[in-house]
């Protein structure tokens, strides 16, 4: 697969799957016997959500949202939830938490629908970039401030399909 110039390996596919498996086992233990709903923000979280839900050995429902938050503008909904999450146990599935603006908006919107519980799982957490006080409940790995590409993470829509995650020197 052609790589973009300036890409340095950060996490291999095997390392990613090990993180995903650990997160899935933790979620599975916590939600055993409960109605679980995974919310997958498009586009970046699709690969992580697909891998995570296949590793969670529980009945679950998945729904998708798409939000946009251009720099300096407010968050807008491009695709909203299609299922009722009232009194359901909801987990937002994020591939990476950066500034937290979009995730904070989504969390508040979901809480307004009165789920039984709401938690956040993040494959990668980048607290150094946080603009809002939002914390994931489950984290695959906490990272420093770096620009990553692959496994759903993109550079102008390129690289989401890479199996590994790369540090991208802009």
Segments (PLM) and residue ranges:
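PRPP-associated nucleotide enzymes
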Residues: 1-170
């Amino acid at each position: 697969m052609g790589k973009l110039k300036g890409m340095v390996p950060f996490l291999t596919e095997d390392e990613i799957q090990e993180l995903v498996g650990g997160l899935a086992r933790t979620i599975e233990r916590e939600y055993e016997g409960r109605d679980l709903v995974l919310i997958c923000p498009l586009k970046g979280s699709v690969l992580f959500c697909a891998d995570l839900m296949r590793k969670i050995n529980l009945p679950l429902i998945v729904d998708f949202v798409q939000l946009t938050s251009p720099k300096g503008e407010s968050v807008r909904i491009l695709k909203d939830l299609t299922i009722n999450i009232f009194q359901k146990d909801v987990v937002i599935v994020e591939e990476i938490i950066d500034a937290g603006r979009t995730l904070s908006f989504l969390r508040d919107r979901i809480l307004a629908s009165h789920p039984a519980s709401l938690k956040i799982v993040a494959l990668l957490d980048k607290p150094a970039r946080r603009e809002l006080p939002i914390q994931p409940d489950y984290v695959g790995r906490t990272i420093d401030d770096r620009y990553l590409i692959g496994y759903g993470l993109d550079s102008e829509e390129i690289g989401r399909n890479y199996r590994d995650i790369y540090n991208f020197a802009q």
